[in-house]
């Protein structure tokens, strides 16, 4: 059964706390001293909107205020939970609502995160409030959660990782090497390293196909014939470079009529020719006869 959108609790709560003077009294009384000292409650301003999920609006109500905190924008988010039994997920919900308020602040063209102070107003049957208000306590390992979320997040900055180190990364090495250099270098300069990694046998046939098509779309080399020819010779598993028909299927394009397919084939062939590939290799890749490739060459 759908929860009602409003309740008597909802109505009376908002009737009081939507008034600035009443809200100021509430916050002066109930905000912890260390937080109250951060806030200039004379700047308190009621904000529009709600962060409560639709499925919970019959059980929860919220009010959001903006306020200056030590001269910077901040928010106070008050949630009233009017269920008879407290929600075991409430601490996590409060964190999620706070992040939603931060996100809305960023969407308004701000480039810094505001401090959002979540406040729960509880009036349930169980007394005192029986649950922790620390979201870390909801984790299987609260101490580990504190370490993870109170520290900078792990960063894999491949741009500063030496190539020699990347070459030791086994199955992920070929992807990292390409991601590092795809924009900056002629792919021919990577050929020796790519061949070494392919010969080590870590890369599957389907991964090689994906890698080669990625290089065709995003990479650059002045010696495309030699580069792609060498790579084809090193392939394993019997898989060759993706034909255009396969490319169509992967991209969801193989749905049109033959005329549409022919036009896209010619466009693809033109891109390959512009990268310096021979007409024979382009014909194989684009799945077109040499006569069609010659027509494309005449159009370039």
Swiss-Prot record:
Highest taxon of the lineage: Bacteria
Record InterPro entries: Rpn/YhgA-like_nuclease, RpnA, Transposase_31
Phenotype caused by lack of the gene: A quadruple rpnA-rpnB-rpnC-rpnD deletion shows no change in basal RecA-independent recombination.
Any one of the GO BP annotations: DNA recombination
Keyword set includes Magnesium: yes
Keywords carried by this UniProt record: DNA recombination, Endonuclease, Hydrolase, Magnesium, Nuclease
Matches recorded under Pfam families: Transposase_31
EC id: 3.1.21.-
One Gene Ontology term of the molecular function aspect: double-stranded DNA endonuclease activity
Family according to the record: Belongs to the Rpn/YhgA-like nuclease family.
Functional note: A low activity DNA endonuclease yielding 3'-hydroxyl ends. Upon expression enhances RecA-independent DNA recombination 2.9-fold, concomitantly reducing viability by 59% and inducing DNA damage as measured by induction of the SOS repair response.
Name used for this protein in its record: Recombination-promoting nuclease RpnC
Protein's organism: Escherichia coli (strain K12)
Gene name per UniProt: rpnC
């Amino acid at each position: 059964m759908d929860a009602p959108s409003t309740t008597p609790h909802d109505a009376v709560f908002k009737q009081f706390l939507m008034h600035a003077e009443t809200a100021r009294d509430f916050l002066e009384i109930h905000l912890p001293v260390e937080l109250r000292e951060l806030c200039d409650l004379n700047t308190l301003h009621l904000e529009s909107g709600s962060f409560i999920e639709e499925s919970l609006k019959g059980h929860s109500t919220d009010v959001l205020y903006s306020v200056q905190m030590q001269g910077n924008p901040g928010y106070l988010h008050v949630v009233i939970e009017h269920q008879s039994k407290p929600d075991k997920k409430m601490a996590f919900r409060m964190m999620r609502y706070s992040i939603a308020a931060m996100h809305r602040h960023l969407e308004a063209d701000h480039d810094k995160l505001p401090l959002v102070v979540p406040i729960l107003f509880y009036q349930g049957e169980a007394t005192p409030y029986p649950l922790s208000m620390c979201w870390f306590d909801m984790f299987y390992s609260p101490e580990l959660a504190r370490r993870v979320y109170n520290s900078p997040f792990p960063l894999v900055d491949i741009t500063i990782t030496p190539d020699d180190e990347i070459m030791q990364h086994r199955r992920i090495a070929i992807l990292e090497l390409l991601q590092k250099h795809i924009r900056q270098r002629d792919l021919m300069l990577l050929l020796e390293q790519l061949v070494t990694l392919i010969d080590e046998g870590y890369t599957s046939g389907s991964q090689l196909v994906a890698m080669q098509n990625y290089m065709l779309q995003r990479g650059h080399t002045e010696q495309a014939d030699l580069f792609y020819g060498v790579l084809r010779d090193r392939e394993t598993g019997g898989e060759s470079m993706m034909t255009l028909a396969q490319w169509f299927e992967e991209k969801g394009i193989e749905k049109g009529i033959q005329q549409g397919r022919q036009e896209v084939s010619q466009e693809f062939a033109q891109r390959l020719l512009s990268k310096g590939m021979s007409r024979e290799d382009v014909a194989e890749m684009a799945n077109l006869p040499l006569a069609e490739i010659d027509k494309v060459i005449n159009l370039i």
